[in-house]
Amino acid sequence: MPKLHLISLGCNKNLVDSEIMLGRLQNYDITDDISDADVIIVNTCGFIKSAKEESIQTILEMHEARKNGSLLVVTGCLMQRYKDELIKELPEVDLFTGVADYDKIDEIILKKQNLFSPETYLQANEERVITGSNYHAYIKISEGCNQKCSFCAIPTFKGKLKSRSLENITNEVKNLVKKGYYDFSFLSQDSSSYMRDQGINDGLINLIDEIEKINGVRSARILYLYPSTTSKELISRIIASPIFHNYFDMPIQHISENMLKIMKRGSGAKKIKELLNLMRNAQNSFLRTGVIVGHPGESEEDFEELCEFLEEFKFDRISAFAYSKEEDTASFEMEQIPAKIISKRLSKIEKITKKAINESLQKELGKQIYASLEGISSEGEMFYAAKKDIWDKDIDGEILINESDVKELEIGSLYLCEVSDVVDQKLVATIIKKAK
Protein backbone atom coordinates (compact mmCIF):
# COMPACT_ATOMS: atom_id res chain seq x y z
CA MET A 1 0.00 0.00 0.00
CA PRO A 2 1.15 3.58 -0.61
CA LYS A 3 2.21 5.50 2.50
CA LEU A 4 0.82 8.76 3.89
CA HIS A 5 2.23 11.32 6.32
CA LEU A 6 -0.21 13.98 7.55
CA ILE A 7 0.54 16.95 9.79
CA SER A 8 -2.36 18.87 11.33
CA LEU A 9 -1.44 22.35 12.58
CA GLY A 10 -3.48 24.84 14.60
CA CYS A 11 -6.70 24.18 16.47
CA ASN A 12 -8.72 21.03 17.10
CA LYS A 13 -11.27 22.19 14.52
CA ASN A 14 -8.43 21.69 12.03
CA LEU A 15 -7.82 18.26 13.53
CA VAL A 16 -11.39 17.23 12.69
CA ASP A 17 -10.79 18.25 9.07
CA SER A 18 -7.57 16.23 9.05
CA GLU A 19 -9.43 13.19 10.37
CA ILE A 20 -11.97 13.57 7.56
CA MET A 21 -9.11 13.51 5.05
CA LEU A 22 -7.75 10.38 6.72
CA GLY A 23 -11.19 8.84 6.33
CA ARG A 24 -10.97 9.45 2.56
CA LEU A 25 -7.45 8.00 2.38
CA GLN A 26 -7.85 4.66 4.14
CA ASN A 27 -6.14 2.92 1.24
CA TYR A 28 -2.89 4.44 2.53
CA ASP A 29 -0.68 3.20 5.35
CA ILE A 30 0.06 5.98 7.84
CA THR A 31 3.77 6.56 8.45
CA ASP A 32 5.67 8.79 10.87
CA ASP A 33 8.70 8.65 8.57
CA ILE A 34 8.46 11.60 6.17
CA SER A 35 11.17 10.19 3.90
CA ASP A 36 9.14 6.99 3.47
CA ALA A 37 5.83 8.68 2.57
CA ASP A 38 4.41 8.67 -0.96
CA VAL A 39 2.02 11.49 -0.06
CA ILE A 40 2.61 14.22 2.54
CA ILE A 41 -0.29 16.47 3.59
CA VAL A 42 0.13 19.63 5.65
CA ASN A 43 -3.15 21.00 7.02
CA THR A 44 -2.20 24.61 7.77
CA CYS A 45 -3.34 27.31 10.19
CA GLY A 46 -3.67 30.93 9.05
CA PHE A 47 -5.10 32.60 12.15
CA ILE A 48 -2.26 34.77 13.47
CA LYS A 49 1.33 35.59 12.54
CA SER A 50 3.00 32.88 14.63
CA ALA A 51 0.65 30.20 13.24
CA LYS A 52 1.31 31.34 9.67
CA GLU A 53 5.06 31.21 10.24
CA GLU A 54 4.80 27.71 11.72
CA SER A 55 2.79 26.54 8.70
CA ILE A 56 5.33 27.88 6.19
CA GLN A 57 8.24 26.43 8.18
CA THR A 58 6.55 23.03 8.34
CA ILE A 59 5.90 22.99 4.57
CA LEU A 60 9.57 23.73 3.85
CA GLU A 61 10.73 21.09 6.35
CA MET A 62 8.47 18.49 4.73
CA HIS A 63 9.93 19.33 1.32
CA GLU A 64 13.50 18.98 2.60
CA ALA A 65 12.81 15.57 4.16
CA ARG A 66 10.67 13.94 1.47
CA LYS A 67 11.79 11.36 -1.06
CA ASN A 68 11.91 11.85 -4.83
CA GLY A 69 8.59 11.20 -6.53
CA SER A 70 6.45 11.91 -3.46
CA LEU A 71 3.54 14.36 -3.49
CA LEU A 72 3.50 17.33 -1.13
CA VAL A 73 -0.08 18.56 -0.61
CA VAL A 74 -0.91 21.75 1.30
CA THR A 75 -4.43 22.49 2.51
CA GLY A 76 -6.25 24.40 5.24
CA CYS A 77 -6.77 27.96 6.41
CA LEU A 78 -3.42 29.46 5.37
CA MET A 79 -3.91 28.20 1.82
CA GLN A 80 -7.47 29.51 1.67
CA ARG A 81 -6.43 32.92 2.97
CA TYR A 82 -3.34 33.42 0.79
CA LYS A 83 -3.85 30.99 -2.10
CA ASP A 84 -2.73 33.28 -4.94
CA GLU A 85 0.46 34.39 -3.18
CA LEU A 86 1.41 30.93 -1.91
CA ILE A 87 0.88 29.13 -5.20
CA LYS A 88 3.40 31.57 -6.70
CA GLU A 89 5.84 31.55 -3.79
CA LEU A 90 5.91 27.84 -2.91
CA PRO A 91 7.22 25.90 -5.92
CA GLU A 92 8.17 23.15 -3.45
CA VAL A 93 4.48 22.19 -3.16
CA ASP A 94 2.85 19.86 -5.70
CA LEU A 95 -0.83 20.33 -4.89
CA PHE A 96 -2.82 23.13 -3.25
CA THR A 97 -6.34 23.14 -1.83
CA GLY A 98 -8.17 25.24 0.78
CA VAL A 99 -10.98 24.74 3.31
CA ALA A 100 -13.70 23.57 0.93
CA ASP A 101 -12.57 20.18 -0.30
CA TYR A 102 -11.45 17.95 2.57
CA ASP A 103 -13.92 15.30 1.41
CA LYS A 104 -12.37 15.37 -2.08
CA ILE A 105 -8.74 14.97 -1.02
CA ASP A 106 -8.54 11.51 -2.58
CA GLU A 107 -9.70 12.90 -5.95
CA ILE A 108 -7.26 15.82 -5.72
CA ILE A 109 -4.36 13.41 -5.20
CA LEU A 110 -5.58 11.03 -7.91
CA LYS A 111 -6.06 13.78 -10.52
CA LYS A 112 -3.04 15.79 -9.31
CA GLN A 113 -4.99 19.02 -9.72
CA ASN A 114 -5.37 21.99 -7.37
CA LEU A 115 -8.92 22.56 -6.15
CA PHE A 116 -10.51 25.57 -4.42
CA SER A 117 -14.29 25.18 -4.33
CA PRO A 118 -16.18 28.37 -3.37
CA GLU A 119 -18.05 27.16 -0.26
CA THR A 120 -16.34 26.21 3.02
CA TYR A 121 -16.68 22.47 3.62
CA LEU A 122 -19.45 21.56 6.06
CA GLN A 123 -19.20 18.03 7.43
CA ALA A 124 -22.16 15.77 6.72
CA ASN A 125 -21.91 11.97 7.02
CA GLU A 126 -18.28 11.44 6.03
CA GLU A 127 -16.36 8.80 7.96
CA ARG A 128 -13.48 10.11 10.07
CA VAL A 129 -10.41 8.33 11.35
CA ILE A 130 -10.10 9.52 14.95
CA THR A 131 -6.49 10.10 15.98
CA GLY A 132 -4.77 10.22 19.35
CA SER A 133 -7.49 8.55 21.41
CA ASN A 134 -9.62 5.42 21.65
CA TYR A 135 -12.24 7.02 23.92
CA HIS A 136 -12.47 10.78 23.11
CA ALA A 137 -13.50 12.59 19.91
CA TYR A 138 -14.03 16.18 18.85
CA ILE A 139 -17.35 16.90 17.15
CA LYS A 140 -17.55 19.98 14.95
CA ILE A 141 -21.06 21.46 15.02
CA SER A 142 -20.72 24.34 12.55
CA GLU A 143 -18.40 26.22 10.22
CA GLY A 144 -17.74 29.92 9.77
CA CYS A 145 -18.69 32.83 12.00
CA ASN A 146 -21.10 35.79 11.90
CA GLN A 147 -19.27 37.81 14.56
CA LYS A 148 -17.37 40.95 13.59
CA CYS A 149 -14.47 41.03 16.06
CA SER A 150 -12.03 43.77 15.07
CA PHE A 151 -8.95 41.54 15.36
CA CYS A 152 -10.17 38.39 13.62
CA ALA A 153 -9.92 37.53 9.92
CA ILE A 154 -11.53 34.09 10.17
CA PRO A 155 -14.89 35.11 8.62
CA THR A 156 -13.02 36.39 5.54
CA PHE A 157 -11.72 32.92 4.66
CA LYS A 158 -14.11 30.61 6.53
CA GLY A 159 -17.28 32.47 5.57
CA LYS A 160 -20.52 33.01 7.45
CA LEU A 161 -21.97 30.65 10.05
CA LYS A 162 -23.22 27.33 8.65
CA SER A 163 -24.57 24.83 11.17
CA ARG A 164 -24.60 21.07 10.74
CA SER A 165 -27.98 19.42 11.16
CA LEU A 166 -28.80 17.83 14.50
CA GLU A 167 -29.33 14.54 12.69
CA ASN A 168 -25.83 14.62 11.17
CA ILE A 169 -24.24 15.35 14.53
CA THR A 170 -26.19 12.74 16.48
CA ASN A 171 -25.53 10.11 13.79
CA GLU A 172 -21.81 10.79 14.02
CA VAL A 173 -21.84 10.48 17.80
CA LYS A 174 -23.88 7.25 17.64
CA ASN A 175 -21.42 5.72 15.16
CA LEU A 176 -18.46 6.68 17.35
CA VAL A 177 -20.16 5.22 20.44
CA LYS A 178 -20.45 1.92 18.55
CA LYS A 179 -16.66 2.03 18.13
CA GLY A 180 -16.10 2.51 21.86
CA TYR A 181 -15.90 6.30 22.18
CA TYR A 182 -17.67 7.72 25.23
CA ASP A 183 -16.24 11.22 25.78
CA PHE A 184 -16.98 14.10 23.39
CA SER A 185 -15.98 17.75 22.96
CA PHE A 186 -18.35 19.81 20.80
CA LEU A 187 -16.73 22.77 19.07
CA SER A 188 -16.90 25.43 16.36
CA GLN A 189 -15.80 29.05 15.90
CA ASP A 190 -18.80 30.23 17.94
CA SER A 191 -20.57 27.25 19.48
CA SER A 192 -23.27 29.28 21.24
CA SER A 193 -24.48 30.52 17.82
CA TYR A 194 -25.23 26.97 16.68
CA MET A 195 -28.37 26.98 14.46
CA ARG A 196 -28.77 30.78 14.56
CA ASP A 197 -28.14 30.78 10.81
CA GLN A 198 -31.39 28.82 10.58
CA GLY A 199 -33.35 31.16 12.86
CA ILE A 200 -33.05 28.99 15.99
CA ASN A 201 -31.60 30.83 19.00
CA ASP A 202 -31.45 27.89 21.41
CA GLY A 203 -29.86 25.39 19.03
CA LEU A 204 -27.19 24.38 21.52
CA ILE A 205 -29.85 23.52 24.09
CA ASN A 206 -31.53 21.32 21.46
CA LEU A 207 -28.17 19.66 20.80
CA ILE A 208 -27.68 18.90 24.50
CA ASP A 209 -31.19 17.39 24.63
CA GLU A 210 -30.43 15.04 21.72
CA ILE A 211 -26.95 14.00 22.86
CA GLU A 212 -28.31 13.04 26.28
CA LYS A 213 -30.62 10.51 24.60
CA ILE A 214 -27.69 8.55 23.12
CA ASN A 215 -26.83 5.47 25.18
CA GLY A 216 -23.09 5.14 25.65
CA VAL A 217 -22.22 8.84 25.84
CA ARG A 218 -20.64 9.06 29.27
CA SER A 219 -19.35 12.62 29.30
CA ALA A 220 -19.26 15.73 27.11
CA ARG A 221 -18.30 19.39 27.10
CA ILE A 222 -18.79 22.42 24.84
CA LEU A 223 -15.88 24.56 23.66
CA TYR A 224 -15.82 28.17 22.36
CA LEU A 225 -18.86 29.84 23.86
CA TYR A 226 -19.18 33.47 22.73
CA PRO A 227 -20.33 36.01 25.36
CA SER A 228 -22.93 37.81 23.23
CA THR A 229 -24.63 34.57 22.14
CA THR A 230 -24.39 32.71 25.46
CA SER A 231 -27.63 32.88 27.44
CA LYS A 232 -28.41 32.22 31.09
CA GLU A 233 -30.79 29.51 29.86
CA LEU A 234 -27.92 27.73 28.10
CA ILE A 235 -25.77 27.84 31.23
CA SER A 236 -28.68 26.49 33.30
CA ARG A 237 -29.20 23.67 30.79
CA ILE A 238 -25.54 22.65 30.95
CA ILE A 239 -25.67 22.71 34.76
CA ALA A 240 -28.79 20.50 34.73
CA SER A 241 -27.26 17.96 32.35
CA PRO A 242 -26.22 14.51 33.63
CA ILE A 243 -23.88 14.13 30.63
CA PHE A 244 -22.40 17.55 29.90
CA HIS A 245 -19.85 18.64 32.48
CA ASN A 246 -20.00 22.07 34.09
CA TYR A 247 -17.14 22.95 31.78
CA PHE A 248 -17.33 26.51 30.52
CA ASP A 249 -14.91 27.64 27.82
CA MET A 250 -15.71 31.26 27.01
CA PRO A 251 -12.91 33.46 25.60
CA ILE A 252 -13.63 36.96 26.93
CA GLN A 253 -10.60 38.59 25.14
CA HIS A 254 -10.84 41.58 27.52
CA ILE A 255 -12.91 42.99 30.38
CA SER A 256 -12.47 46.76 29.93
CA GLU A 257 -15.62 48.39 28.51
CA ASN A 258 -13.42 50.54 26.30
CA MET A 259 -11.63 47.52 24.83
CA LEU A 260 -14.76 45.41 24.42
CA LYS A 261 -16.20 48.20 22.26
CA ILE A 262 -13.00 48.66 20.23
CA MET A 263 -12.73 44.89 19.75
CA LYS A 264 -16.39 44.77 18.66
CA ARG A 265 -17.21 41.93 21.01
CA GLY A 266 -20.96 42.58 21.06
CA SER A 267 -21.42 42.52 24.84
CA GLY A 268 -20.24 44.61 27.76
CA ALA A 269 -18.37 43.78 30.94
CA LYS A 270 -21.56 43.60 33.02
CA LYS A 271 -23.05 40.76 30.95
CA ILE A 272 -19.72 38.92 30.78
CA LYS A 273 -19.34 39.04 34.56
CA GLU A 274 -22.95 37.89 35.08
CA LEU A 275 -22.39 34.88 32.83
CA LEU A 276 -19.06 34.02 34.46
CA ASN A 277 -20.55 34.20 37.95
CA LEU A 278 -23.36 31.84 36.93
CA MET A 279 -20.76 29.44 35.56
CA ARG A 280 -18.51 29.71 38.60
CA ASN A 281 -21.39 29.09 41.02
CA ALA A 282 -22.22 25.77 39.35
CA GLN A 283 -21.16 22.69 41.32
CA ASN A 284 -17.66 21.43 40.41
CA SER A 285 -17.43 23.98 37.61
CA PHE A 286 -14.33 24.41 35.45
CA LEU A 287 -13.79 27.74 33.68
CA ARG A 288 -11.44 28.37 30.79
CA THR A 289 -10.99 31.68 28.97
CA GLY A 290 -8.73 33.46 26.50
CA VAL A 291 -7.50 37.05 26.40
CA ILE A 292 -5.65 39.28 23.94
CA VAL A 293 -3.15 41.89 25.13
CA GLY A 294 -1.83 44.82 23.12
CA HIS A 295 -4.82 45.30 20.82
CA PRO A 296 -4.88 48.83 19.33
CA GLY A 297 -6.50 51.24 21.76
CA GLU A 298 -5.51 49.34 24.91
CA SER A 299 -4.38 51.90 27.49
CA GLU A 300 -2.41 51.11 30.63
CA GLU A 301 -5.65 51.55 32.57
CA ASP A 302 -7.43 49.04 30.30
CA PHE A 303 -4.60 46.55 30.72
CA GLU A 304 -4.47 46.93 34.51
CA GLU A 305 -8.23 46.42 34.68
CA LEU A 306 -7.81 43.14 32.79
CA CYS A 307 -4.98 42.02 35.09
CA GLU A 308 -6.99 42.80 38.22
CA PHE A 309 -10.01 40.92 36.92
CA LEU A 310 -7.99 37.82 36.01
CA GLU A 311 -6.36 37.83 39.45
CA GLU A 312 -9.68 38.23 41.26
CA PHE A 313 -11.93 35.90 39.29
CA LYS A 314 -9.73 32.78 39.51
CA PHE A 315 -10.21 31.03 36.19
CA ASP A 316 -9.03 27.41 36.04
CA ARG A 317 -7.25 27.92 32.74
CA ILE A 318 -6.34 31.10 30.83
CA SER A 319 -4.86 31.29 27.33
CA ALA A 320 -3.13 34.63 26.76
CA PHE A 321 -2.15 35.91 23.32
CA ALA A 322 -0.25 38.92 22.07
CA TYR A 323 -2.28 40.91 19.56
CA SER A 324 -1.44 39.96 15.97
CA LYS A 325 -1.96 42.58 13.24
CA GLU A 326 -3.96 40.82 10.53
CA GLU A 327 -4.98 41.95 7.06
CA ASP A 328 -8.72 42.23 6.36
CA THR A 329 -9.55 43.16 9.96
CA ALA A 330 -10.86 46.43 11.41
CA SER A 331 -7.89 46.74 13.78
CA PHE A 332 -5.37 46.50 10.93
CA GLU A 333 -5.82 50.21 10.13
CA MET A 334 -5.78 51.36 13.77
CA GLU A 335 -2.76 52.93 15.46
CA GLN A 336 -0.67 50.01 16.69
CA ILE A 337 0.87 49.58 20.15
CA PRO A 338 4.69 49.15 20.07
CA ALA A 339 5.88 45.52 20.17
CA LYS A 340 7.97 46.15 23.31
CA ILE A 341 4.91 47.25 25.26
CA ILE A 342 2.88 44.27 24.02
CA SER A 343 5.68 41.90 25.04
CA LYS A 344 5.90 43.46 28.50
CA ARG A 345 2.14 43.20 29.00
CA LEU A 346 2.05 39.61 27.79
CA SER A 347 4.81 38.70 30.24
CA LYS A 348 2.78 40.10 33.14
CA ILE A 349 -0.41 38.34 32.01
CA GLU A 350 1.46 35.03 31.66
CA LYS A 351 2.56 35.26 35.31
CA ILE A 352 -1.08 35.75 36.32
CA THR A 353 -2.06 32.83 34.10
CA LYS A 354 0.54 30.52 35.62
CA LYS A 355 -0.56 31.45 39.15
CA ALA A 356 -4.24 30.85 38.31
CA ILE A 357 -3.51 27.42 36.84
CA ASN A 358 -1.35 26.42 39.83
CA GLU A 359 -4.07 27.51 42.27
CA SER A 360 -6.65 25.49 40.33
CA LEU A 361 -4.42 22.41 40.40
CA GLN A 362 -3.63 22.79 44.11
CA LYS A 363 -7.36 22.51 44.85
CA GLU A 364 -7.21 18.91 43.59
CA LEU A 365 -4.67 17.78 46.23
CA GLY A 366 -5.99 14.93 48.36
CA LYS A 367 -9.15 14.58 46.30
CA GLN A 368 -10.45 11.47 44.59
CA ILE A 369 -11.24 12.18 40.94
CA TYR A 370 -12.27 10.24 37.84
CA ALA A 371 -9.77 10.20 34.99
CA SER A 372 -9.37 8.40 31.66
CA LEU A 373 -6.08 6.57 31.08
CA GLU A 374 -4.30 8.03 28.03
CA GLY A 375 -1.13 5.95 27.69
CA ILE A 376 2.54 6.72 28.32
CA SER A 377 3.03 10.21 29.78
CA SER A 378 4.93 13.15 28.30
CA GLU A 379 7.50 12.54 31.06
CA GLY A 380 8.36 9.10 29.65
CA GLU A 381 7.63 5.49 30.58
CA MET A 382 7.98 6.06 34.34
CA PHE A 383 4.41 7.36 34.38
CA TYR A 384 1.11 6.73 32.69
CA ALA A 385 -0.86 9.80 31.60
CA ALA A 386 -4.51 10.40 32.43
CA LYS A 387 -7.11 13.11 31.78
CA LYS A 388 -9.54 14.25 34.45
CA ASP A 389 -13.06 13.52 33.23
CA ILE A 390 -14.16 17.18 33.13
CA TRP A 391 -11.04 18.38 31.26
CA ASP A 392 -10.84 18.73 27.53
CA LYS A 393 -8.28 16.48 25.90
CA ASP A 394 -4.77 17.96 25.39
CA ILE A 395 -5.43 21.57 26.43
CA ASP A 396 -6.27 21.37 30.15
CA GLY A 397 -3.40 19.33 31.50
CA GLU A 398 -1.99 15.91 32.22
CA ILE A 399 -2.24 13.68 35.26
CA LEU A 400 0.85 11.58 35.96
CA ILE A 401 -0.06 8.13 37.30
CA ASN A 402 2.80 6.83 39.43
CA GLU A 403 1.03 3.99 41.24
CA SER A 404 -2.00 1.77 40.76
CA ASP A 405 -4.03 -0.56 42.94
CA VAL A 406 -5.38 -2.07 39.70
CA LYS A 407 -2.99 -4.55 38.08
CA GLU A 408 -4.34 -4.78 34.53
CA LEU A 409 -4.76 -1.21 33.25
CA GLU A 410 -6.64 -0.49 30.03
CA ILE A 411 -5.89 2.54 27.85
CA GLY A 412 -9.06 4.59 27.39
CA SER A 413 -10.80 3.27 30.49
CA LEU A 414 -12.06 5.50 33.28
CA TYR A 415 -10.55 5.11 36.76
CA LEU A 416 -11.02 6.55 40.22
CA CYS A 417 -7.74 8.20 41.21
CA GLU A 418 -6.37 9.94 44.31
CA VAL A 419 -4.30 13.08 43.75
CA SER A 420 -1.12 13.21 45.85
CA ASP A 421 1.00 16.01 44.36
CA VAL A 422 1.34 18.85 41.86
CA VAL A 423 4.61 18.97 39.90
CA ASP A 424 5.35 21.43 37.07
CA GLN A 425 1.65 22.14 36.48
CA LYS A 426 0.81 18.44 36.40
CA LEU A 427 -1.18 16.43 38.91
CA VAL A 428 0.36 13.24 40.31
CA ALA A 429 -2.13 10.53 41.25
CA THR A 430 -2.64 6.89 42.19
CA ILE A 431 -5.26 4.71 40.51
CA ILE A 432 -7.59 3.24 43.13
CA LYS A 433 -10.13 1.30 41.07
CA LYS A 434 -11.83 1.10 37.70
CA ALA A 435 -15.00 3.16 37.33
CA LYS A 436 -18.26 1.26 36.95
UniProtKB/Swiss-Prot annotation:
Record GO terms (molecular function): 4 iron, 4 sulfur cluster binding; aspartic acid methylthiotransferase activity; metal ion binding; protein methylthiotransferase activity
Cofactors named for this entry: [4Fe-4S] cluster
GO biological process: tRNA modification
PROSITE patterns in the record: MTTASE_N, MTTASE_RADICAL, RADICAL_SAM
Domain MTTase N-terminal: 2-114
EC number(s) from the headed UniProt entry: 2.8.4.4
Primary residence: cytoplasm
Location(s) in or outside the cell: Cytoplasm
Positions that bind [4Fe-4S] cluster 1: 11, 45, 77
Binding site for [4Fe-4S] cluster 2: 145, 149, 152
Top EC class for this record: transferase
Known catalytic reactions: L-aspartate(89)-[ribosomal protein uS12]-hydrogen + (sulfur carrier)-SH + AH2 + 2 S-adenosyl-L-methionine = 3-methylsulfanyl-L-aspartate(89)-[ribosomal protein uS12]-hydrogen + (sulfur carrier)-H + 5'-deoxyadenosine + L-methionine + A + S-adenosyl-L-homocysteine + 2 H(+)
Any one GO cellular component localisation term in the record: cytosol
Record note on cofactor: Binds 2 [4Fe-4S] clusters. One cluster is coordinated with 3 cysteines and an exchangeable S-adenosyl-L-methionine.
Highest taxon of source: Bacteria
Keywords, alphabetical: 4Fe-4S, Cytoplasm, Iron, Iron-sulfur, Metal-binding, S-adenosyl-L-methionine, Transferase
Sequence ranges assigned to domain Radical SAM core in this UniProt record: 131-368
Protein family according to the UniProt entry: Belongs to the methylthiotransferase family. RimO subfamily.
Family annotation (NCBIfam families): 30S ribosomal protein S12 methylthiotransferase RimO, MiaB/RimO family radical SAM methylthiotransferase
Function: Catalyzes the methylthiolation of an aspartic acid residue of ribosomal protein uS12.
Official protein name in the record: Ribosomal protein uS12 methylthiotransferase RimO
Name of the gene: rimO
